[in-house]
Regions:
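Sec-dependent signal peptide recognition
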Residues: 2-10
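C-terminal motif of bacterial Sec signal peptides marking the signal peptidase cleavage site
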Residues: 15-18
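Bacterial lipoprotein signal-peptidase II cleavage site
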Residues: 20-28
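Active-site beta->alpha N-cap acidic-glycine motif
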Residues: 63-139
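Hydrophobic faces of well-ordered beta-strands that scaffold small-molecule active sites
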Residues: 76-81, 99-105, 124-130, 169-173, ...
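Catalytic beta/alpha-barrel core
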Residues: 79-83, 102-108, 150, 172-182, ...
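Alpha-helical scaffold elements lining the catalytic groove of polysaccharide deacetylases
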Residues: 141-163, 179-185, 212-250
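C-terminal domain-boundary segment and adjacent tail
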Residues: 193-206, 265-299
Length: 299
């Protein structure tokens, strides 16, 4: 009996450990689990043959999509989140992407300023990837915008983040399902970003975002993420699904906004494949600065 109890306790502990590592979604399927926004460690260096190997687009090209080049699809904006931690060859390889692809850089990290300088040097626009309070227990960083903060404290923090990447042209939220749902917080955020001459891209980690209402009250144009490219994974099946989903934006005037992440070379390879396929299908990329010009005035 004692042995049976021990085995049952061990099974229960293993089950609890497995559950602890999981993170719940904030909303419907189109909203990302916030662990997707958690920086990971830099992957080990790989040899040159692996790094520069050709892309296998066979599966992506073979699929019969529900749209074609003749359809009236808007251009795409691609933003890569979570720069600031990775460095070395992986970072350099991300800069080899088309210049229209933008880098969203986390503040207060070892490679924050180096990533901002390298992005600027290689022609990529920079966004401040502002850490914000999530609903769950994920850690957004040492300093982040949270519910209950005074407007002056929010302004000071945003100014400090901006000083680390003064070439930034916009900002988007890192995590933030709690903070972006708070009207007073987002009003203070948008007011300060306006003072800094930056526009805001809502990463849409919650379906209860207060950004539209706060922006409307201020007469401030904002953008919203449409697609997370690397959710749930970086497989060809996922990429095909994302490309297929572009068809629902036929006839829309505003560009399609796509976010992915820089954590691993697998994500870089998937992004390269996605760009190669949609380019072959006639879609164009534009940088976030051109996105802003195409945004509709707030309602």
């Amino acid at each position: 009996l004692e042995k049976t109890v021990s085995i049952l306790l061990l099974i229960a502990l293993l089950f609890l450990a497995a559950c602890k590592g999981k993170s719940a979604k904030d909303g419907p399927e189109e909203y990302s689990p916030e662990y997707q926004e958690t920086p990971s460690t830099e992957e080990p260096a790989q040899n040159d043959s692996s790094r520069h190997s050709g892309l296998d687009l066979k599966e992506l090209k073979a699929y019969q999509y529900n749209w074609s080049e003749s359809d009236d699809l808007p251009p795409l904006v691609i933003v890569i989140d979570d720069f600031g931690q990775i460095s070395g060859q992986l970072l350099e390889d991300f800069t080899a992407l088309p210049q229209e692809v933008a880098f969203a850089i986390l503040p207060d990290l070892p490679n924050t300023q180096a990533a901002a300088r390298l992005a600027d040097k290689t022609g990529h626009e920079v966004l401040i990837h502002v850490p914000m309070q999530p609903l769950g227990n994920d850690n957004p960083g040492k300093r982040y915008i949270k519910k209950g903060m005074e407007a002056a404290d929010i302004a000071d923090l945003l100014q400090e983040f901006y000083s680390q990447m003064p070439n930034a042209i916009a900002a988007n939220n890192h995590m933030g399902s709690a903070a972006t749902a708070d009207y007073s917080v987002m009003q203070a955020v948008l007011e300060e970003l306006h003072e800094l001459g930056l526009f805001f891209l809502d990463s849409a980690t919650t379906n209860k975002s207060a950004v539209p209402s706060a922006a409307s009250a201020l007469g401030y144009k904002t953008a919203k993420r449409d697609i997370f490219l690397d959710v749930p994974d970086n497989s060809d099946a996922t990429l095909i699904g994302k490309i297929q989903s572009l068809g629902k934006y036929k006839g829309r005037n505003e560009p399609i906004v796509i976010i992915t992440h820089c954590h691993t070379r697998e994500k870089l390879n998937a992004l390269n494949k996605f760009i190669a396929q949609i380019s072959d299908m006639g879609l164009k990329l534009i940088p976030p600065s051109k996105l802003y010009k195409k945004l509709s005035p707030p309602a």
